[in-house]
Curated annotation (Swiss-Prot):
<dbReference type="InterPro" id="IPR038594">
    <property type="entry name" value="SepF-like_sf"/>
</dbReference>
<comment type="function">
    <text>Cell division protein that is part of the divisome complex and is recruited early to the Z-ring. Probably stimulates Z-ring formation, perhaps through the cross-linking of FtsZ protofilaments. Its function overlaps with FtsA.</text>
</comment>
<keyword id="KW-0131">Cell cycle</keyword>
<protein>
    <recommendedName>
        <fullName>Cell division protein SepF</fullName>
    </recommendedName>
</protein>
<comment type="similarity">
    <text>Belongs to the SepF family.</text>
</comment>
<dbReference type="GO" id="GO:0043093">
    <property type="term" value="P:FtsZ-dependent cytokinesis"/>
</dbReference>
<dbReference type="GO" id="GO:0000917">
    <property type="term" value="P:division septum assembly"/>
</dbReference>
<keyword id="KW-0963">Cytoplasm</keyword>
<dbReference type="GO" id="GO:0005737">
    <property type="term" value="C:cytoplasm"/>
</dbReference>
<dbReference type="InterPro" id="IPR007561">
    <property type="entry name" value="Cell_div_SepF/SepF-rel"/>
</dbReference>
<dbReference type="Pfam" id="PF04472">
    <property type="entry name" value="SepF"/>
</dbReference>
<keyword id="KW-0132">Cell division</keyword>
<keyword id="KW-0717">Septation</keyword>
<comment type="subunit">
    <text>Homodimer. Interacts with FtsZ.</text>
</comment>
<dbReference type="InterPro" id="IPR023052">
    <property type="entry name" value="Cell_div_SepF"/>
</dbReference>
Length: 156
């Protein structure tokens, strides 16, 4: 029967291994190596050596923070302001000298844009607003004062 299996294995490309080819010394199998009870030493590396290499990072990079100041004349300028917000740039808008209806439409459009972009809008004075994207935090006493007066109840 083993000859038949050997022929099948040879045909398939496998080699049949006879167990008789391996001879073990009985003495080697019966002897056990002595195991020493030594504590295992573990070494952890947290990468702190590389962090302490003293790298110098230039804080004056080519990307500077830009704030846009805009004085829209018509409702069509509101889309340009919204594009600045989409590019993560805060905008100060001055609505002085524009008709009240157009100013209200611009603020309504920008308020919706700010909400959609998860930004914030703050009133600085009667006709001046700061509109900031979500990566800019606007803080100050005036913000808290305006929130208490509920000028913009949806403001953060």
């Amino acid at each position: 029967m083993s000859k038949l299996l050997n022929k099948v294995f040879n045909f398939v490309g496998w080699e049949a291994v006879d167990e008789d080819e391996y001879e073990y010394d009985e003495q080697e199998l019966n002897t056990k190596e002595e195991v020493k009870d030594e504590p295992i030493q573990t070494h952890f590396f947290n990468g702190s050596k590389k962090q302490q290499s003293g790298k110098v990072v230039n804080i004056h990079t080519g990307n500077q923070f830009k704030m846009i100041v805009s004085q829209p004349n018509t409702f069509d300028d509101a889309q340009d302001i919204c594009d600045h917000l989409k590019n993560k740039k805060p905008v100060v808008i001055n609505l002085e000298g524009i008709e009240k209806q157009d100013a209200q439409r611009i603020i309504d459009f920008l308020s919706g844009s700010v909400y959609a972009l998860d930004g914030s809008i703050q009133k600085v004075s009667c006709d001046i607003f700061v509109i900031a994207p979500n990566n800019v935090d606007v803080s100050g006493d005036l913000k808290d004062e305006l929130r208490n007066k509920t000028v913009f109840p949806w403001a953060k």
